[in-house]
């Protein structure tokens, strides 16, 4: 869990470009204890399978398997309509590619649901959220939209109906992954990290000092050395 938090922090503070990002070096450095899945249709493995780059996909799979060992799974999804599983041909192409790689390598498959929102009824709210994030209008026919896909958290019985006959082991692997997750988070209290502060200060007094000194330095024409010698009262 600590490694996962480290990766998230690095992605947000150092790797962000529109979205938080991490690279292979970071994953290799902080992989211990983390279970890794090959990702949705936009992952680097899936994109190569979509584009017909089977060698490139296999090379990446081999790298992930080497780094994460028995904690790496090939991830199948299907967000077309339940009555038409191949509604999105690209997803079907990815799944077939993953199934082939699983046979060649012996790596385990797992079925997942790319849940962007909880219930199917939340799809419209999700479209509005996408508009806010991309600065577009609902009326724009060329805007980013995911309305053609079912991205809610699918009920277990629907997953079993879709995958159970052909890939029962891939469904069982979801339970195996859950059983391997050993972190228990304490709920009901604030879990904000403790920020290191100088002797004689608490978090509030130190924040006040930084804020007021920052205001004086930026707007009163004093030097940095002069500003750092001021108390909060003098800054006010």
Where is each model-derived feature located?
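Phosphodiester-processing cores and adjacent nucleic acid-binding clamps
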Residues: 1-236
């Amino acid at each position: 869990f600590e490694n996962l938090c480290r990766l998230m922090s690095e992605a947000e503070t150092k790797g962000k470009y529109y979205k938080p990002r991490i690279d292979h070096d970071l994953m290799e450095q902080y992989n211990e204890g983390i279970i890794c899945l090959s990702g949705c249709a936009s992952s680097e493995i899936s994109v190569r399978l979509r584009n017909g780059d089977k060698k490139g996909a296999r090379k990446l799979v081999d790298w992930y398997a080497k780094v994460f060992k028995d904690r790496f799974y090939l991830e199948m999804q299907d967000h077309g309509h339940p009555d038409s599983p191949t509604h999105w041909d690209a997803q079907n192409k990815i799944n077939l590619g993953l199934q082939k790689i699983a046979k060649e390598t012996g790596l385990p498959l797992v079925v997942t649901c790319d849940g962007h929102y909880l219930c199917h009824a939340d799809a419209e709210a999700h479209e509005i959220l996408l508009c806010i994030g991309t600065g577009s209008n609902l009326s724009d026919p060329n805007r980013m939209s995911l309305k053609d896909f079912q991205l809610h958290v699918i009920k277990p019985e629907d997953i079993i109906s879709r995958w159970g006959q052909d890939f029962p082991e891939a469904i069982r692997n979801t339970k195996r992954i859950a059983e391997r997750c050993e972190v228990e988070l304490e709920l009901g209290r604030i879990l904000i990290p403790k920020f290191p502060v100088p002797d004689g200060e608490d978090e509030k007094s130190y924040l006040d000092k930084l804020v007021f000194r920052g205001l004086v330095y930026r707007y009163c024409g004093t030097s940095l050395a002069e500003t750092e010698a001021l108390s909060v009262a003098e800054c006010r």
